A protein has these predicted regions:
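The feature marks the mature, well-folded catalytic cores of soluble enzymes
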Residues: 1-307
């Protein structure tokens, strides 16, 4: 089968998701931090909001593959006990080389890559890489600038060993020509919460998250230091600033569908307006419960194929 998703804005053809069931009933005020949730959620509304999102993607002609449909009964039963499994982005990244099976930082998510790897094998996507200790890599730290360039955040969830493993595989395998490693401050969980390439010439950007430390830009000539904003502007991108409140509420965590169409949470009104002025068609979904888990539309999708 065809696979590979090396942009954020190419036509999205196939995506892996996980429909939440009653696993979120496990979350209590006492264990919510261990489960990486901001608070308890009402599981039926959480599920309903997710259904709205997945139905929207199907209505746009995107093939939505649900994780549990690819697992055996025992594996599916385990998946339905994992509150964070809904954020499939973090568990796997699919490049033109195949699926990169990642390694999660916290105990609440450690088994997720095993399940997603089984799903990728069932789909016929080759496993291009398995992240192994001491490396840690979470998929929310990948943001593709274009087909030849990927940005990867590290420090908070992914680590330096993970950066090196992924960089060596992608660059060594000829999948990318430039690899930009972006150090994140302690308050920023993943890179996709602070920057998003909306098109070849427009990016959402949060200066408070990304302006503290220079990034490492690797290319065929070696490595150089450059602040990410300067790097993006040097590539000719227009920067649209997200403010602290918007970023807290996943205002930059948008999933592109292709042809200047994308999906955002419905309350992201200012950024939606700016994108609308630039010719984007921004589709919206509710997320009063989904966002409590700590993710947005980008987080809940693991692209398998873009064109």
């Amino acid at each position: 089968m065809k696979f590979g998703a090396q942009t954020e804005y190419g036509r999205l053809r196939k995506v892996l998701m996980h429909r939440p069931t009653e696993e979120n009933r496990r979350i209590t005020p006492g264990n919510k931090d261990a489960y990486l949730f901001r608070d308890v959620v009402y599981w039926k509304e959480f599920q309903r909001e997710h259904d709205v999102f997945s139905d929207l993607l199907r209505d746009e002609g995107i093939e939505v593959v649900m994780l549990t449909d690819l697992l055996d009964e025992d594996q599916a039963g385990i998946a339905e006990t994992l509150p964070n499994m809904v954020y499939t982005r973090d568990v796997c990244m699919v490049s033109r080389l195949g699926a990169h099976s990642l390694r999660m930082t916290y105990a609440a998510r450690q088994v997720e890559p095993f399940l997603v790897e089984k799903a990728m094998e069932k789909l016929g996507v080759p496993i291009a890489q398995r992240i192994t200790p001491p490396a840690l890599v979470e998929g929310g730290d990948f943001v593709w600038l274009n087909e030849e360039t990927v940005m990867m955040g590290f420090i908070t969830r992914s680590n330096e060993a993970g950066v090196n493993m992924v960089r060596e595989r992608l660059m060594g395998g000829g999948a990318v020509k430039e690899f930009v490693a972006v150090p994140l401050p302690s308050f920023r969980v993943h890179l996709d919460g602070a920057v998003m390439a909306m098109s070849p010439d427009i990016a959402l950007f949060h200066e408070a998250s990304l302006g503290l430390y220079p990034a490492y830009v690797y290319d065929g000539e070696g490595v150089r230091l450059q602040y990410l904003r300067d790097y993006l502007e040097g590539k000719g991108l227009e920067i649209i600033e997200g403010n602290d409140t918007e970023v807290r509420m996943f205002g930059t965590n948008i999933i592109g569908l292709g042809d200047y169409k994308c999906v955002s949470y419905e309350w992201n009104e200012r950024i939606i307006g700016i994108l609308d002025d630039r010719g984007f068609d921004v589709l919206t979904i509710p997320g009063s419960q989904l966002s409590i888990g700590g993710g947005g539309p980008h987080c809940m999708t693991c692209p398998i194929l873009r064109e």
